[in-house]
Amino acid sequence: MRKVSFVLAAVLAATSLFAARNAPWTKEKAWEWYNAQPWIRGCNYMPASAANRVDQWQELGSEARFAEVECELALAETIGFNALRILVEEQGFGVWLVEHDGFMARFERMLSIMAKHKMRAIVVLGNDCSRPKEIWTLPKPGVQQYDVGYHGGRRRTQHGSFPGAVGYTVLDDPELAPKFYRMCEELLTKYRDDDRILFWNLWNEPGNNNRSPLTCENLRKLFDMAWRIDPKQPLAADIWRVRGQHAEGRSPAEKMAGELSDIISYHCYGNLQMQQQTIQALRARWGRPLVNTEWLARINGDEVFTSYPLFAQNRVGCTCWGFVAGKYQTYEPYESMWADQFTYKRPDAPVTKWYHDLFRPSHHPYDPKEIDVIRRVNAQMDAEREGKSLRAKIAKSCKITGEDMWYGYRRTKFEFKGRKAWVVEPSCTPKKGIPWTWTMQWAEAFVDRTGVPDLLAKGYPHVTLDVFDTRMDENGLKACAEFQDFLVKELGFVKKCNLIGMSWGGFFSTRYAAAYPQNVRRIYLDAPLLNFDGFNAMAIGPWAASAPADGKWTADPRMPVNLAPQVVKGDIPVLLLYGGQDQTVPPASNAELFAARFKAAGGRIDVEKRGGFGHHPHGVDPNKTARIVNFVTTAK
């Protein structure tokens, strides 16, 4: 302990040289720092063989554990992670107290391995996830016990096992509390200028386990210390219970965390809608960069497929909970979730899914599709930073007008030669050559019934261009051909597209395919308008100026019902669905006439007449889109 005291004395002497501050960074400085970083993404990390954070930091078994860390961080590097949230808190403090020099050496070694694999540390010091005093013991090095089959390796955890109880921590012990602060001071001082530290997450979930009245004073004390040391990295404490407009959390401790933080670290384990609402609420309230330092709860609907692209789209940093499944067992549900099953509070909760974690002990993914999404989104964000992303390519020649999430996928809106256009990117790796789909009209209608989201999930980008004012006359054809040329030459899409034509979109698709058969691979038509007979002049736009003298469009060679042979000549297969009771676009003079002529010309056409259907709804039930998807993805 004399050596520890000597080290701490040196630390205290060093801190007196620092230029202290007494408030959070300005918002401008916070954003300047954040914008200088790549998109932050990673996980909360503990080696799979560690039963808890005592195991993570203690001498016992450390050599084997560091070999494991090397393998696991190499795995994290392959999927594009660049940050790890590592918790020291009171379990690490228990090691620091007994094995001070060894702890500091192992902390340094951890940072070095992380840097080797291109990752930086988010370091957690305080923690309010705790259990009542009656069962609390000071964490100590040695063999760590754990219960098999329980979240966190404990039968009785801080996650709902003690409702109403106040958690107990080392900061409640008058002898241990000063020593805990010394540990924090030593780490903050030693690494205040170290680029391997991304930021200091000073407190995990302040106010959890009913500790808010106790934590406010401690939280302020730790921030005051950190301000005196003034590291070059930002400081943050977690807001972890954001609900709707409650962007300050639900306790004084959380509100204080937001008020003291340079950047906002928050936790959200909710579904896509809740994630979106949380981001909006936090941005509106705090106006600072956001990092969701805990997410991924499949049982709650917090999925990689939806949340991860959302964070990227909104430039919100994120670290999921868990990496390789191990002794800590956070892939298991909370015990309270099992109780909800047995008492029928949440009988439909999918508790057989993994709750957290990404990889199995074998290092095979829990779900390979999740890892593909993570890799793809990471690559997209890195490419964007380098000016090589799809969005960046679009921005070279077009004005970006907006970005959003469209059915869980990133959509970039832009102007193409004065017309509204957008491209939706798949989150997974695109198919070789980037095959794609194009809804030519009504691109926002009946989307989940058209198979488009399913095709995005398979790696097919989706696009549209607004040419409705032309009703696909010669000007519309030219505009679409120029748009496709842009997509192929500038964005790397394959030469031939898969067209989706609902109602007016059927008119557009067939005319385009007949004019540019070399540009079209397949067409899915749904209740298509293929003939103007029965339409008034107001509906057909510029076509009214060239209407047949007798008003009969069926014989007009420009009508799609008369273009079937040209489409067949282009060897373009067609899937045609229509309603037998369609009063808007009568089948006899549209779908059925086209189908008959298409077949007569020797074309490949799959027709389904749905006798009880009218013009709407287009598409098929969302759980029956396989027919459309298979049609588009079939090789020939």
What function would you assign to each model-found segment?
Residues 22-261, 285, 295, 299, ...:
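Active-site mouth of glycoside hydrolases
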Residues 446-463:
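Short amphipathic alpha-helix adjacent to the substrate-entry channel of hydrolases
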Residues 166, 192-197, 481-503, 514-520:
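Gly/Ser-rich "nucleophile elbow"/oxyanion-hole loop immediately N-terminal to the catalytic nucleophile
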Residues 275-282, 533-540, 544-599:
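The feature captures the conserved acid-bearing segment of alpha/beta-hydrolase catalytic domains
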Residues 327-346, 351-353, 358-363, 367-371, ...:
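C-terminal catalytic histidine-bearing segment of alpha/beta-hydrolase fold enzymes
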Residues 386-430, 541-543:
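A domain-start/cap signature at the N-terminus of enzymes
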